[in-house]
A protein has these predicted regions:
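C-terminal membrane-associated helical module and adjoining short loops/tails
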Residues: 1-23, 40-53, 128-129, 133-213
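Membrane-embedded alpha-helical segments that form the functional core of polytopic membrane enzymes
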Residues: 14-16, 21-72, 88-96, 102-115, ...
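Core segments of transmembrane alpha-helices
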Residues: 18-26, 80-92, 118-123, 145-157
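Residue-level signature of transmembrane alpha-helix interfaces in integral membrane proteins
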Residues: 29, 35, 72-75, 93, ...
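Conserved G/P- and acidic residue-centered "switch" motifs that form tight phosphate/ATP-binding loops
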Residues: 56, 77, 119
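Membrane-proximal helix-loop-helix units in multi-pass membrane proteins
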Residues: 102, 116-135
Length: 213
């Protein structure tokens, strides 16, 4: 690999991995920034979250544009996505409960479970498929899920934490619609992957074959 190509590779991997410290900045500000959150800290947390969301698009775009797609990137990108979900959803549940939106907090718990359950279910199906020589490329539902998830999480945070005198407000119906859409796309994605890997799942459900005599 040439020096120029190596630096392009490092640049793309850096875009992926920088998501983790950005998420930690968001977490630290949300937990320890005080309540109500000062405007400066709100801007810092929101900016960190928006940058983390943007890197999810930038890393894939630049990897293809610079022709430095790699196996490391194919594993690191979903890993950092999971880190994003694992950090942001519990934080949003905490923030919703803190401002007295207990019903909203309960729904966010359900939404978090759906996101994490979908990831675990797809990983399980892929592992099962590998035993039977069956694989499936990423489909539209996975891409749609990611495309919807990041704006939804950012919108929820803005809705919960934006200062009272902030000029721009996100209406509750918009936030609610995004949350329902996110829940729906997770269920759809689980169904699509289940259908793709059904032959492997069906073979395993039949139980072990009798040993040859």
């Amino acid at each position: 690999m040439s020096v120029s190509r190596r630096w392009k590779f490092y640049f793309v991997q850096g875009l992926t991995l920088v998501r983790v410290p950005l998420i930690l900045v968001f977490l630290a500000v949300s937990l320890f920034g005080g309540y109500p959150l000062p405007k400066a800290w709100f801007v810092v947390a929101l900016g960190a979250m928006l940058l983390a969301a943007a890197t999810d698009w930038w890393d894939g775009y630049f990897a293809r544009r610079l022709e430095v797609t790699s196996r490391l990137g194919s594993y690191a990108d979903p890993m950092t996505d999971k880190a994003f979900y694992l950090t942001t959803f519990p934080t949003l549940v905490y923030l919703a409960a803190r401002v007295g939106q207990h019903g909203h907090a309960r729904f966010l718990v359900v939404l978090a479970i759906l996101f994490l359950l979908r990831d675990q279910w797809v990983s399980f199906l892929r592992s099962l498929g590998a035993l039977h020589g069956l694989s499936a490329a990423a489909n539209w539902s996975g891409k749609a899920r990611t495309l919807i998830a990041f704006p939804t999480i950012c919108a929820i945070y803005y809705y919960l934490q934006a200062p009272a005198d902030w000029p721009l407000r996100i209406p509750w119906p918009v936030v609610c619609s995004l949350e329902v859409l996110s829940a729906g796309i997770n269920l759809v994605s689980m169904g699509i992957y289940s259908r793709q890997f059904w032959p492997a799942l069906r073979a395993e459900l039949r139980g072990p074959t009798d040993p040859a005599r």
